[in-house]
Amino acid sequence: MVKCLIVDDDYKILHYVSQHLEAAQIQTVTQASGESAIAYLANNKVDIAVVDIMMTGMDGFELCQLLKNDYDLPVIMLTARDALSDKERAFVSGTDDYVTKPFEVKELLFRIQAVLRRYQINSQDIIKLGNVTLIQEYMELSVDSKNVNLPTKEFQLLFLLCGQPKHIFTRDTLIERIWGFDYEGDERTIDVHIKRLRHRLNQLKATIEIQTVRGQGYRVITHV
């Protein structure tokens, strides 16, 4: 069962959202502050977080950044603020989606399901390329006898590239396939993830390489 963390300092909203998500077979955990949410995550795992922006103490923007950077969690921001600048700041903070109050819980549910589909792991899929094996079930990169569990986005990016070796993927395609078509953040996030992957592959002495094709994008090739 999917487990959703809901963070809002309005207890009525916590109860309202939790009640409806539970009815849709989504397990929920509610926290009334960003600080308590981080404390909970120190010893517990969830699949997705729904975060209110306007909270006392740690606000939703700061919490979203922590959830993305430290836990690589999918996040949907929930707020009464509809200004374009707020939406922009939300996406810069790393949110996967944005819902404005008042809202229909069905809409929130649809968005949760859509975001989770982008993060979904198919346990049947294994890719072997050169001396590299990628196992989706565990988000595991294996090079010879060395195993590394990758962050979700890094794994999804490498899995996509390795699934079609020599195929050139544009930045736009990679962003749409991994972050979603409605992603409004900086496209340079692709470059950051590629740099990290290259470093990992180099350290593990992998026989695959992520190449930059000038003016086009990225592809994976193998070295014998």
From Swiss-Prot:
Modified residue annotations for 4-aspartylphosphate: D52
Subcellular location: Cytoplasm
DNA-binding region per Swiss-Prot/TrEMBL record: 124-222
UniProt keyword DNA-binding, yes or no: yes
Transmembrane segments: none
Modification after translation (UniProt): Phosphorylated by HssS.
Superkingdom, natural source: Bacteria
GO MF term list: phosphorelay response regulator activity; transcription cis-regulatory region binding
Pfam families attached to this UniProt entry: Response_reg, Trans_reg_C
CDD domains according to UniProt: REC_OmpR, trans_reg_C
Signal peptide per UniProt: none
GO terms classed as biological process: regulation of DNA-templated transcription
InterPro entries, per the entry: CheY-like_superfamily, OmpR/PhoB-type_DNA-bd, Sig_transdc_resp-reg_receiver, WalR-like, WH-like_DNA-bd_sf
Functional note: Member of the two-component regulatory system HssS/HssR involved in intracellular heme homeostasis and tempering of staphylococcal virulence. Phosphorylated HssR binds to a direct repeat sequence within hrtAB promoter and activates the expression of hrtAB, an efflux pump, in response to extracellular heme, hemin, hemoglobin or blood.
Protein name: Heme response regulator HssR
